[in-house]
Each structure stands twice: as structure tokens, then as C-alpha cells.
Design a protein with these regions (language model features):
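Short proline/glycine- and polar residue-rich coil/turn motifs
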Residues: 111-120
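C-terminal motif of bacterial Sec signal peptides marking the signal peptidase cleavage site
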Residues: 17-20
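Short glycine/proline/serine/threonine-rich loop/turn segments at secondary-structure transition edges
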Residues: 130-142
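Short beta-strand and strand-turn-strand segments in soluble, beta-rich domains
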Residues: 95-112
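Bacterial N-terminal signal peptides that target proteins for export
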Residues: 1-10
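Acidic/polar, low-complexity intrinsically disordered N-terminal segments immediately downstream
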Residues: 22-99, 174-176
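Beta-sandwich strand segments
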Residues: 29, 150-164
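Ligand-binding face of N-terminal immunoglobulin V-set domains in extracellular IgSF glycoproteins
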Residues: 123
Length: 176
């Protein structure tokens, strides 16, 4: 009798569970596509580590290298597109110590997000000549960037709208 009742409850639970399942799990995104800087990294354990800054150091690069290109991943949230779209990057002047033409080369504030891509890259050429080479008295140069909304993109998550880039010419302590 007890076993019969237990079987009945088990069967009833299974029916309720199957009844509640919905096979339509595709929830099409309805809003405007959003753009953001990739603001996390995934460690070897699969955990996401969130950060609002990127360290770029010439410390281990041979001294003959006078400039290098920083590659910032940019990602968007939303539906894919089969056409190129534009996004806007501006410099946050009150948080920036870097000088255009001295610490980095000028870049276009309007950038192209390539068609059929989920992530793209913002390229910034960093110049080595004016960077401090002394760790003890070394200065970290800051360049703070901010994404702005365009006709093609709204802004993404708060943590990915602004990105602080710190660059120097000495062996810096790792951020991990």
C-alpha cells in the first residue's frame, strides 16, 4: 500500500514536470543591439575575473621596439548583423594623463564593428619614447576610454562602458 502510494506520487511528479516543460526556449532579443568593452577574463578554472582596466607594459619588450599596438576586445549584446556598423569611442579627459602624439597615436573616434562578428578589436598604437623606464619613480600613464551610443548601438553593461588603460616602460607587478 505504501509502495503503491509512493509510486503514485512519483508518477504524478513526473507528469507535472513534463507538463511544465516548454520546448520553445528561443527568446529572440527584442531591444537595440548594445556594445561594451570586454570587461572580464576567464581564468584556467573557468571563473570570470572582472576588471575595468588593462595594463600595457613595454617592460619585457626589447628596447629596439619603439611602438606597439594595444588590442582591446569590444563585444556586443544582441542580434548579429550582416553589415558593418559603427560605434564611437571617446577619451575621458579628466581621467587621462596620456598625451596624444606623445604616448599614443591618434585614432578615429568612429570605429567599425565588422559584419557577422560577435567581438571586434579596437587598436591603439602606444609610443614608448616618453614613458618612464624607472620602476622606483616610474609613472603609469593613463588613457581612459568611454563608449558612446550611436545609431547602430546602445550602451552595454555598466562595467564595460569605460576602460582604463595603464601603460609604462618598466616591469610592472601583474594584476593577478
Amino acid at each position: 500500500m505504501k509502495m503503491n502510494r509512493l509510486s503514485y506520487y512519483f508518477l504524478l511528479s513526473c507528469v507535472a514536470l513534463l507538463w511544465s516543460c516548454d520546448q520553445d526556449i528561443d527568446y529572440p532579443y527584442q531591444g537595440k543591439d548594445r556594445i561594451q568593452f570586454q570587461h572580464y577574463t576567464v581564468d584556467w578554472n573557468g571563473n570570470r575575473n572582472y576588471s575595468d582596466s588593462t595594463l600595457f607594459s613595454f617592460g619585457l619588450i626589447p628596447s629596439e621596439v619603439r611602438e606597439d599596438t594595444l588590442k582591446l576586445p569590444v563585444e556586443y549584446l544582441g542580434n548579429g548583423s550582416d553589415r558593418d556598423r559603427t560605434y564611437k569611442v571617446s577619451i575621458v579627459a579628466d581621467s587621462t594623463t596620456a598625451v596624444e602624439g606623445v604616448h599614443y597615436l591618434a585614432f578615429n573616434s568612429l570605429q567599425t564593428f565588422r559584419a557577422n562578428e560577435l567581438t571586434d578589436t579596437l587598436y591603439i598604437v602606444v609610443l614608448r619614447e616618453a614613458l618612464s623606464k624607472d620602476y622606483a619613480e616610474g609613472e603609469n600613464i593613463r588613457l581612459e576610454l568611454k563608449l558612446e551610443a550611436t545609431d547602430d548601438f546602445a550602451l552595454g553593461l555598466d562595467g564595460g562602458i569605460q576602460r582604463k588603460i595603464v601603460f609604462n616602460d618598466f616591469m610592472a607587478e601583474p594584476t593577478w
